[in-house]
Amino acid sequence: MDKRFAVVLAAGQGTRMKSKLYKVLHPVCGKPMVEHVVDEARKLSLEKLVTIVGHGAEDVKKQLGEKSEYALQAEQLGTAHAVKQAKSILGSEKGTTIVICGDTPLLTAETMEAMLTEHQKKAAKVTILTAVAEDPTGYGRIIRNENGDVAKIVEHKDATEEERLVKEINTGTYCFDNEALFQTIEQVSNDNVQGEYYLPDVIEILKNQGETVAAYQTVNFQETLGVNDRVALSQAEIYMKQRINKRHMQNGVSLIDPDNTYISPEAVIGRDTVIYPGTVIKGRVVIGEDAVIGQNSELENSTVGSRTVIKQSVIVDSEVGDDVTIGPFAHIRPDSKIGNEVRIGNFVEVKKSEFGDRSKASHLSYIGDAEIGTDVNLGCGSITVNYDGKHKFKTKIENGAFIGCNSNLVAPVTIGEGAYVAAGSTITDDVPGRALSIARARQVNKEDYAENIHKK
Protein backbone atom coordinates (compact mmCIF):
# COMPACT_ATOMS: atom_id res chain seq x y z
CA MET A 1 0.00 0.00 0.00
CA ASP A 2 1.22 3.49 -0.87
CA LYS A 3 2.15 5.82 1.93
CA ARG A 4 -0.75 7.96 3.06
CA PHE A 5 -0.75 11.56 4.20
CA ALA A 6 -3.42 14.05 5.20
CA VAL A 7 -3.74 17.82 5.09
CA VAL A 8 -6.47 19.37 7.24
CA LEU A 9 -7.45 22.91 6.23
CA ALA A 10 -8.08 24.88 9.42
CA ALA A 11 -6.80 28.39 8.76
CA GLY A 12 -10.01 30.27 7.93
CA GLN A 13 -11.27 32.91 10.33
CA GLY A 14 -14.94 31.93 10.17
CA THR A 15 -16.42 35.43 10.26
CA ARG A 16 -19.94 34.10 9.65
CA MET A 17 -19.84 32.40 13.06
CA LYS A 18 -19.76 35.89 14.62
CA SER A 19 -17.74 34.54 17.51
CA LYS A 20 -14.59 35.23 19.50
CA LEU A 21 -13.86 31.50 19.29
CA TYR A 22 -11.88 30.32 16.27
CA LYS A 23 -14.28 28.54 13.90
CA VAL A 24 -12.85 25.03 13.87
CA LEU A 25 -12.72 25.01 17.67
CA HIS A 26 -16.49 25.32 18.00
CA PRO A 27 -17.64 22.07 19.60
CA VAL A 28 -19.97 19.50 18.09
CA CYS A 29 -21.29 17.22 20.84
CA GLY A 30 -18.66 18.64 23.17
CA LYS A 31 -15.65 18.06 20.89
CA PRO A 32 -14.07 20.72 18.64
CA MET A 33 -14.90 20.32 14.94
CA VAL A 34 -11.28 20.08 13.86
CA GLU A 35 -10.59 17.39 16.45
CA HIS A 36 -13.43 15.27 15.03
CA VAL A 37 -11.77 15.60 11.61
CA VAL A 38 -8.26 14.83 12.85
CA ASP A 39 -9.35 11.84 14.94
CA GLU A 40 -11.18 10.28 11.98
CA ALA A 41 -8.25 10.93 9.64
CA ARG A 42 -5.82 9.30 12.07
CA LYS A 43 -7.70 6.01 11.59
CA LEU A 44 -6.41 5.85 7.99
CA SER A 45 -2.90 4.55 8.81
CA LEU A 46 -1.27 7.84 7.89
CA GLU A 47 2.45 8.46 7.73
CA LYS A 48 1.97 12.16 8.44
CA LEU A 49 -0.92 14.49 9.18
CA VAL A 50 -0.50 18.24 8.72
CA THR A 51 -3.01 20.79 9.97
CA ILE A 52 -2.90 24.17 8.23
CA VAL A 53 -3.44 26.86 10.86
CA GLY A 54 -3.90 30.59 10.62
CA HIS A 55 -6.27 32.56 12.82
CA GLY A 56 -6.12 31.15 16.34
CA ALA A 57 -3.13 28.97 15.44
CA GLU A 58 -1.87 28.57 19.00
CA ASP A 59 -5.32 27.61 20.27
CA VAL A 60 -5.65 24.92 17.61
CA LYS A 61 -2.18 23.56 18.39
CA LYS A 62 -3.01 23.47 22.09
CA GLN A 63 -6.23 21.54 21.40
CA LEU A 64 -4.75 18.98 19.01
CA GLY A 65 -1.32 18.66 20.60
CA GLU A 66 0.78 15.84 19.18
CA LYS A 67 -2.04 14.44 17.06
CA SER A 68 -0.79 16.55 14.16
CA GLU A 69 2.07 18.45 12.61
CA TYR A 70 1.38 22.07 11.72
CA ALA A 71 1.99 24.55 8.92
CA LEU A 72 1.11 28.23 9.17
CA GLN A 73 -0.88 30.10 6.53
CA ALA A 74 -0.13 33.64 7.66
CA GLU A 75 -2.39 35.17 4.99
CA GLN A 76 -5.60 33.46 3.94
CA LEU A 77 -5.14 33.45 0.15
CA GLY A 78 -7.27 30.46 -0.79
CA THR A 79 -7.36 26.69 -0.43
CA ALA A 80 -4.52 25.95 -2.86
CA HIS A 81 -2.34 28.48 -1.05
CA ALA A 82 -3.25 26.76 2.24
CA VAL A 83 -2.22 23.30 0.98
CA LYS A 84 0.99 24.78 -0.41
CA GLN A 85 2.07 25.62 3.15
CA ALA A 86 2.47 21.87 3.79
CA LYS A 87 5.08 21.55 1.03
CA SER A 88 8.02 21.82 3.43
CA ILE A 89 6.69 18.74 5.27
CA LEU A 90 5.14 16.67 2.46
CA GLY A 91 6.60 18.04 -0.78
CA SER A 92 9.29 15.37 -1.19
CA GLU A 93 7.06 12.42 -0.25
CA LYS A 94 5.64 9.79 -2.58
CA GLY A 95 2.18 8.43 -1.95
CA THR A 96 -1.40 9.64 -1.58
CA THR A 97 -2.53 12.77 0.23
CA ILE A 98 -6.10 13.34 1.35
CA VAL A 99 -7.13 16.99 1.78
CA ILE A 100 -9.95 17.60 4.26
CA CYS A 101 -11.66 20.75 5.51
CA GLY A 102 -11.42 21.26 9.26
CA ASP A 103 -15.05 22.38 9.41
CA THR A 104 -16.51 19.02 8.25
CA PRO A 105 -16.88 17.24 11.61
CA LEU A 106 -19.29 14.57 10.34
CA LEU A 107 -16.91 13.04 7.80
CA THR A 108 -16.06 9.45 8.79
CA ALA A 109 -12.95 7.36 8.40
CA GLU A 110 -15.05 4.74 6.57
CA THR A 111 -15.98 7.21 3.84
CA MET A 112 -12.41 8.45 3.51
CA GLU A 113 -11.13 4.87 3.33
CA ALA A 114 -13.62 4.07 0.56
CA MET A 115 -12.50 7.17 -1.30
CA LEU A 116 -8.84 6.16 -1.00
CA THR A 117 -9.69 2.69 -2.29
CA GLU A 118 -11.45 4.18 -5.33
CA HIS A 119 -8.48 6.48 -5.91
CA GLN A 120 -6.09 3.52 -5.96
CA LYS A 121 -8.43 1.37 -8.06
CA LYS A 122 -8.69 4.05 -10.76
CA ALA A 123 -4.95 4.85 -10.61
CA ALA A 124 -6.07 8.48 -10.51
CA LYS A 125 -3.98 11.58 -9.93
CA VAL A 126 -6.91 13.09 -8.05
CA THR A 127 -10.19 11.73 -6.69
CA ILE A 128 -13.02 14.02 -5.63
CA LEU A 129 -15.44 13.14 -2.84
CA THR A 130 -18.91 13.91 -4.16
CA ALA A 131 -22.45 13.65 -2.81
CA VAL A 132 -25.99 14.08 -4.07
CA ALA A 133 -27.73 17.11 -2.56
CA GLU A 134 -31.49 17.60 -2.71
CA ASP A 135 -30.81 21.33 -2.89
CA PRO A 136 -27.39 21.83 -4.49
CA THR A 137 -27.63 25.63 -4.55
CA GLY A 138 -24.26 27.20 -3.88
CA TYR A 139 -22.25 24.02 -4.42
CA GLY A 140 -19.88 23.27 -7.28
CA ARG A 141 -21.42 20.70 -9.65
CA ILE A 142 -19.75 17.52 -10.87
CA ILE A 143 -20.22 17.32 -14.63
CA ARG A 144 -19.60 13.85 -16.05
CA ASN A 145 -19.07 12.78 -19.66
CA GLU A 146 -20.90 10.03 -21.55
CA ASN A 147 -18.63 7.40 -19.96
CA GLY A 148 -19.50 8.55 -16.46
CA ASP A 149 -16.07 10.04 -15.85
CA VAL A 150 -15.58 13.50 -14.37
CA ALA A 151 -15.40 16.06 -17.15
CA LYS A 152 -15.20 19.17 -14.98
CA ILE A 153 -16.29 20.92 -11.80
CA VAL A 154 -18.48 23.96 -12.37
CA GLU A 155 -19.08 26.48 -9.60
CA HIS A 156 -22.75 27.37 -9.07
CA LYS A 157 -22.30 30.97 -10.18
CA ASP A 158 -20.66 29.83 -13.43
CA ALA A 159 -23.05 26.96 -14.22
CA THR A 160 -25.52 26.97 -17.11
CA GLU A 161 -29.20 26.34 -16.44
CA GLU A 162 -28.72 22.72 -17.52
CA GLU A 163 -25.66 22.28 -15.28
CA ARG A 164 -27.54 23.71 -12.32
CA LEU A 165 -29.99 20.82 -12.58
CA VAL A 166 -27.16 18.43 -11.64
CA LYS A 167 -27.42 17.38 -8.00
CA GLU A 168 -24.02 15.73 -7.63
CA ILE A 169 -21.83 18.24 -5.82
CA ASN A 170 -18.18 18.74 -4.91
CA THR A 171 -17.78 18.31 -1.14
CA GLY A 172 -14.32 19.87 -0.92
CA THR A 173 -12.54 16.66 0.13
CA TYR A 174 -9.92 15.26 -2.26
CA CYS A 175 -7.31 12.53 -2.70
CA PHE A 176 -4.19 13.49 -4.66
CA ASP A 177 -1.10 11.77 -5.89
CA ASN A 178 1.25 13.65 -3.59
CA GLU A 179 3.93 14.42 -6.20
CA ALA A 180 1.33 15.61 -8.71
CA LEU A 181 -0.30 17.79 -6.06
CA PHE A 182 2.79 19.74 -5.07
CA GLN A 183 4.11 20.02 -8.63
CA THR A 184 0.80 21.25 -10.03
CA ILE A 185 -0.03 23.59 -7.17
CA GLU A 186 2.83 25.83 -8.32
CA GLN A 187 0.92 26.44 -11.57
CA VAL A 188 -2.26 27.71 -9.90
CA SER A 189 -3.04 31.35 -10.62
CA ASN A 190 -4.94 33.90 -8.55
CA ASP A 191 -6.46 35.47 -11.64
CA ASN A 192 -10.00 35.63 -10.29
CA VAL A 193 -12.34 38.11 -8.61
CA GLN A 194 -11.17 37.22 -5.10
CA GLY A 195 -7.48 37.19 -6.02
CA GLU A 196 -7.08 33.80 -4.32
CA TYR A 197 -5.51 30.44 -5.20
CA TYR A 198 -8.15 27.70 -5.37
CA LEU A 199 -7.54 23.97 -4.97
CA PRO A 200 -10.06 22.93 -7.67
CA ASP A 201 -7.76 24.68 -10.16
CA VAL A 202 -5.22 21.92 -9.47
CA ILE A 203 -7.83 19.42 -10.65
CA GLU A 204 -8.49 21.40 -13.82
CA ILE A 205 -4.77 21.58 -14.62
CA LEU A 206 -4.36 17.83 -14.12
CA LYS A 207 -7.42 17.16 -16.28
CA ASN A 208 -6.02 19.35 -19.07
CA GLN A 209 -2.75 17.41 -18.85
CA GLY A 210 -4.66 14.23 -19.61
CA GLU A 211 -4.36 12.79 -16.10
CA THR A 212 -7.10 10.61 -14.62
CA VAL A 213 -9.58 12.51 -12.46
CA ALA A 214 -11.90 10.18 -10.52
CA ALA A 215 -14.83 10.73 -8.18
CA TYR A 216 -16.19 8.74 -5.26
CA GLN A 217 -19.82 9.45 -4.42
CA THR A 218 -20.80 9.01 -0.78
CA VAL A 219 -24.38 7.98 -0.10
CA ASN A 220 -24.58 10.22 2.96
CA PHE A 221 -24.79 13.91 2.08
CA GLN A 222 -25.07 14.85 5.77
CA GLU A 223 -21.55 13.57 6.32
CA THR A 224 -20.14 16.23 4.02
CA LEU A 225 -21.78 19.19 5.78
CA GLY A 226 -19.42 22.14 6.11
CA VAL A 227 -20.01 24.33 9.16
CA ASN A 228 -19.76 28.02 8.36
CA ASP A 229 -22.36 29.56 10.66
CA ARG A 230 -24.40 28.81 13.78
CA VAL A 231 -27.26 27.31 11.77
CA ALA A 232 -24.97 24.72 10.19
CA LEU A 233 -23.36 24.16 13.60
CA SER A 234 -26.75 23.25 15.08
CA GLN A 235 -27.41 20.89 12.16
CA ALA A 236 -24.05 19.20 12.69
CA GLU A 237 -24.87 18.86 16.39
CA ILE A 238 -28.16 17.12 15.57
CA TYR A 239 -26.60 14.73 13.03
CA MET A 240 -23.68 13.88 15.31
CA LYS A 241 -25.99 13.27 18.27
CA GLN A 242 -28.13 10.94 16.16
CA ARG A 243 -25.05 9.04 15.01
CA ILE A 244 -23.68 8.65 18.55
CA ASN A 245 -27.03 7.62 20.04
CA LYS A 246 -27.67 5.11 17.25
CA ARG A 247 -24.28 3.51 17.89
CA HIS A 248 -25.01 3.06 21.59
CA MET A 249 -28.48 1.64 20.93
CA GLN A 250 -27.03 -0.81 18.42
CA ASN A 251 -24.55 -1.85 21.12
CA GLY A 252 -27.30 -2.71 23.59
CA VAL A 253 -27.98 0.55 25.44
CA SER A 254 -31.60 1.67 25.87
CA LEU A 255 -32.28 5.36 25.24
CA ILE A 256 -35.86 6.09 26.25
CA ASP A 257 -35.94 9.33 24.25
CA PRO A 258 -32.90 9.61 21.94
CA ASP A 259 -33.87 13.09 20.74
CA ASN A 260 -33.54 14.39 24.29
CA THR A 261 -30.40 12.50 25.29
CA TYR A 262 -26.96 14.03 24.83
CA ILE A 263 -23.94 11.69 24.83
CA SER A 264 -20.37 12.74 24.08
CA PRO A 265 -18.47 10.93 21.31
CA GLU A 266 -15.94 9.71 23.89
CA ALA A 267 -18.46 8.01 26.19
CA VAL A 268 -18.42 4.23 26.73
CA ILE A 269 -21.66 2.66 27.98
CA GLY A 270 -22.24 -0.98 28.91
CA ARG A 271 -25.02 -3.23 27.68
CA ASP A 272 -28.52 -3.11 29.18
CA THR A 273 -27.92 0.30 30.70
CA VAL A 274 -30.99 2.55 30.44
CA ILE A 275 -30.68 6.29 29.79
CA TYR A 276 -33.72 8.47 30.50
CA PRO A 277 -34.59 11.79 28.81
CA GLY A 278 -32.74 14.97 29.67
CA THR A 279 -29.50 13.16 30.47
CA VAL A 280 -26.28 14.93 29.45
CA ILE A 281 -23.10 12.85 29.27
CA LYS A 282 -20.04 15.02 28.62
CA GLY A 283 -16.39 14.20 28.04
CA ARG A 284 -14.76 10.90 28.91
CA VAL A 285 -17.52 9.02 30.73
CA VAL A 286 -17.51 5.25 31.25
CA ILE A 287 -20.70 3.56 32.47
CA GLY A 288 -20.97 -0.13 33.31
CA GLU A 289 -23.73 -2.59 32.47
CA ASP A 290 -27.32 -2.58 33.77
CA ALA A 291 -27.06 0.98 35.11
CA VAL A 292 -29.98 3.43 35.11
CA ILE A 293 -29.22 7.09 34.39
CA GLY A 294 -31.72 9.96 34.44
CA GLN A 295 -33.93 11.79 34.11
CA ASN A 296 -32.17 15.15 33.82
CA SER A 297 -28.82 13.94 35.11
CA GLU A 298 -25.42 15.29 34.08
CA LEU A 299 -22.25 13.19 34.02
CA GLU A 300 -18.88 14.63 33.05
CA ASN A 301 -15.47 12.94 32.85
CA SER A 302 -16.49 10.27 35.35
CA THR A 303 -16.80 6.50 35.71
CA VAL A 304 -20.00 4.82 36.88
CA GLY A 305 -20.17 1.15 37.82
CA SER A 306 -22.61 -1.57 36.87
CA ARG A 307 -26.16 -1.65 38.27
CA THR A 308 -25.79 1.87 39.63
CA VAL A 309 -28.87 4.11 39.62
CA ILE A 310 -28.53 7.88 39.23
CA LYS A 311 -31.60 10.12 39.39
CA GLN A 312 -31.64 13.86 38.62
CA SER A 313 -28.09 14.38 39.81
CA VAL A 314 -24.74 15.84 38.71
CA ILE A 315 -21.43 13.93 38.78
CA VAL A 316 -18.19 15.61 37.68
CA ASP A 317 -14.62 14.23 37.51
CA SER A 318 -15.38 11.42 39.94
CA GLU A 319 -15.55 7.63 40.30
CA VAL A 320 -18.72 5.79 41.29
CA GLY A 321 -18.73 2.07 42.03
CA ASP A 322 -21.17 -0.78 41.43
CA ASP A 323 -24.69 -1.05 42.88
CA VAL A 324 -24.71 2.58 44.02
CA THR A 325 -27.81 4.76 44.34
CA ILE A 326 -27.41 8.50 43.81
CA GLY A 327 -30.11 11.17 44.02
CA PRO A 328 -32.47 12.64 43.36
CA PHE A 329 -30.78 16.04 43.37
CA ALA A 330 -27.33 14.99 44.55
CA HIS A 331 -24.10 16.67 43.44
CA ILE A 332 -20.86 14.70 43.27
CA ARG A 333 -18.12 17.26 42.74
CA PRO A 334 -14.59 16.68 41.37
CA ASP A 335 -12.11 14.23 42.87
CA SER A 336 -14.68 12.15 44.71
CA LYS A 337 -14.61 8.37 44.87
CA ILE A 338 -17.78 6.49 45.76
CA GLY A 339 -17.38 2.80 46.63
CA ASN A 340 -19.76 -0.09 45.97
CA GLU A 341 -23.31 -0.31 47.36
CA VAL A 342 -23.18 3.28 48.60
CA ARG A 343 -26.28 5.43 49.00
CA ILE A 344 -25.98 9.17 48.26
CA GLY A 345 -29.49 10.54 48.69
CA ASN A 346 -31.49 13.64 47.93
CA PHE A 347 -29.83 17.02 48.31
CA VAL A 348 -26.45 15.59 49.29
CA GLU A 349 -23.28 17.31 48.07
CA VAL A 350 -19.98 15.45 48.02
CA LYS A 351 -16.70 17.25 47.26
CA LYS A 352 -13.23 15.71 47.04
CA SER A 353 -14.25 12.88 49.33
CA GLU A 354 -14.07 9.11 49.43
CA PHE A 355 -16.94 6.85 50.50
CA GLY A 356 -16.18 3.27 51.47
CA ASP A 357 -18.45 0.38 50.50
CA ARG A 358 -22.00 0.30 51.87
CA SER A 359 -21.82 3.74 53.49
CA LYS A 360 -24.81 6.08 53.37
CA ALA A 361 -25.55 9.79 53.31
CA SER A 362 -29.24 9.68 52.55
CA HIS A 363 -30.48 13.24 53.08
CA LEU A 364 -29.46 16.89 53.11
CA SER A 365 -25.72 16.63 53.80
CA TYR A 366 -22.50 18.32 52.75
CA ILE A 367 -19.46 16.04 52.74
CA GLY A 368 -16.28 17.85 51.72
CA ASP A 369 -12.60 16.87 52.00
CA ALA A 370 -13.59 13.72 53.85
CA GLU A 371 -12.50 10.11 54.05
CA ILE A 372 -15.50 7.94 54.87
CA GLY A 373 -14.89 4.30 55.75
CA THR A 374 -17.11 1.30 55.07
CA ASP A 375 -20.59 0.81 56.58
CA VAL A 376 -20.79 4.41 57.83
CA ASN A 377 -24.18 6.08 58.30
CA LEU A 378 -24.40 9.85 57.99
CA GLY A 379 -27.75 11.05 59.32
CA CYS A 380 -29.91 13.75 57.80
CA GLY A 381 -28.23 17.15 57.90
CA SER A 382 -24.73 15.86 58.68
CA ILE A 383 -22.09 18.42 57.71
CA THR A 384 -18.32 18.30 57.49
CA VAL A 385 -17.13 21.79 58.42
CA ASN A 386 -14.01 21.80 56.26
CA TYR A 387 -13.22 25.49 55.72
CA ASP A 388 -12.14 28.14 58.21
CA GLY A 389 -12.15 30.99 55.72
CA LYS A 390 -8.53 30.48 54.68
CA HIS A 391 -7.75 26.77 54.61
CA LYS A 392 -9.48 23.44 53.96
CA PHE A 393 -9.20 20.63 56.49
CA LYS A 394 -9.93 16.91 56.35
CA THR A 395 -12.52 14.85 58.17
CA LYS A 396 -11.97 11.13 58.69
CA ILE A 397 -14.82 8.81 59.65
CA GLU A 398 -13.71 5.23 60.24
CA ASN A 399 -15.54 1.99 59.46
CA GLY A 400 -18.93 1.40 61.02
CA ALA A 401 -19.32 4.84 62.60
CA PHE A 402 -22.78 6.37 63.02
CA ILE A 403 -23.30 10.11 62.71
CA GLY A 404 -26.62 11.35 64.10
CA CYS A 405 -28.86 13.85 62.37
CA ASN A 406 -27.93 17.54 62.26
CA SER A 407 -24.33 16.96 63.35
CA ASN A 408 -21.42 19.26 62.51
CA LEU A 409 -17.97 17.69 62.26
CA VAL A 410 -15.46 20.56 62.53
CA ALA A 411 -12.30 19.54 60.67
CA PRO A 412 -9.63 18.48 61.19
CA VAL A 413 -11.31 15.70 63.13
CA THR A 414 -11.44 11.88 63.23
CA ILE A 415 -14.42 9.77 64.22
CA GLY A 416 -13.15 6.38 65.35
CA GLU A 417 -14.27 2.95 64.20
CA GLY A 418 -17.75 2.03 65.39
CA ALA A 419 -18.20 5.34 67.23
CA TYR A 420 -21.57 7.08 67.64
CA VAL A 421 -22.14 10.82 67.39
CA ALA A 422 -25.40 11.93 68.97
CA ALA A 423 -27.87 13.93 66.92
CA GLY A 424 -27.40 17.68 67.05
CA SER A 425 -23.75 17.50 68.11
CA THR A 426 -20.99 19.86 67.02
CA ILE A 427 -17.81 17.78 67.17
CA THR A 428 -14.52 19.65 67.48
CA ASP A 429 -12.32 16.91 68.97
CA ASP A 430 -11.52 13.38 67.85
CA VAL A 431 -13.99 10.69 68.93
CA PRO A 432 -12.41 7.39 70.02
CA GLY A 433 -13.55 4.13 68.46
CA ARG A 434 -16.69 2.62 70.03
CA ALA A 435 -17.34 5.81 72.00
CA LEU A 436 -20.59 7.78 72.14
CA SER A 437 -20.00 11.50 71.71
CA ILE A 438 -22.60 14.05 72.75
CA ALA A 439 -21.73 17.67 72.06
CA ARG A 440 -24.85 19.75 72.60
CA ALA A 441 -26.40 21.81 75.39
CA ARG A 442 -28.45 19.87 77.94
CA GLN A 443 -32.20 20.22 77.43
CA VAL A 444 -34.02 22.39 79.99
CA ASN A 445 -37.83 22.28 80.29
CA LYS A 446 -39.51 25.30 81.96
CA GLU A 447 -43.00 24.31 83.04
CA ASP A 448 -45.85 26.61 81.87
CA TYR A 449 -43.37 29.11 80.40
CA ALA A 450 -45.10 29.00 77.02
CA GLU A 451 -48.03 30.93 78.54
CA ASN A 452 -45.76 33.95 79.05
CA ILE A 453 -44.80 33.85 75.37
CA HIS A 454 -48.40 33.63 74.19
CA LYS A 455 -49.36 36.69 76.27
CA LYS A 456 -46.82 38.96 74.52
UniProtKB/Swiss-Prot annotation:
Residues noted as binding acetyl-CoA in the record, renumbered to the chain: N386, Y387, A423, R440
Positions of UDP-N-acetyl-alpha-D-glucosamine binding: 9-12, 23, 73, 78-79, 140, 155, 170, 228, 333, 351, 366, 377
Region (Linker): 231-251
GO molecular function terms attached to this record: glucosamine-1-phosphate N-acetyltransferase activity; magnesium ion binding; UDP-N-acetylglucosamine diphosphorylase activity
This protein's UniProt keywords: Acyltransferase, Cell shape, Cell wall biogenesis/degradation, Cytoplasm, Magnesium, Metal-binding, Multifunctional enzyme, Nucleotidyltransferase, Peptidoglycan synthesis, Repeat, Transferase
UniProt keyword annotation of DNA-binding present: no
Protein name in the entry: Bifunctional protein GlmU
PANTHER family: BIFUNCTIONAL PROTEIN GLMU, NUCLEOTIDYL TRANSFERASE
Pyrophosphorylase as annotated region, ranges: 1-230
Subcellular location: Cytoplasm
Principal place of residence: cytoplasm
